[in-house]
Amino acid sequence: MDKFLSSAPVLLTAMMVFTAGLLIEFNRFFPDLLFHP
């Protein structure tokens, strides 16, 4: 359980970076889908 607790922030950061990169790539290919009224 200690190994999981020590690796949790790393996994959380990796997921945040992955999600941000995915949003940026999606916004680059489909710029009008994220900002439609």
From Swiss-Prot:
> InterPro entries under this entry?
PSI_PsaJ (IPR002615), PSI_PsaJ_sf (IPR036062)
Query: Quick one: a GO cellular component term?
Result: plasma membrane-derived thylakoid membrane
Pfam families documented for this protein: PSI_PsaJ
Q: Does the keyword Amino-acid biosynthesis apply?
A: no
Q: Which Gene3D superfamilies match?
A: Single helix bin (1.20.5.510)
Q: Where are the transmembrane segments?
A: 4-24
HAMAP family in the record: PSI_PsaJ
Per the record, the similarity remark reads: Belongs to the PsaJ family.
Name the chain's protein.
Photosystem I reaction center subunit IX
In its UniProt entry, the species of origin is given as Picosynechococcus sp. (strain ATCC 27264 / PCC 7002 / PR-6) (Agmenellum quadruplicatum)
Q: Name the encoding gene, please.
A: psaJ
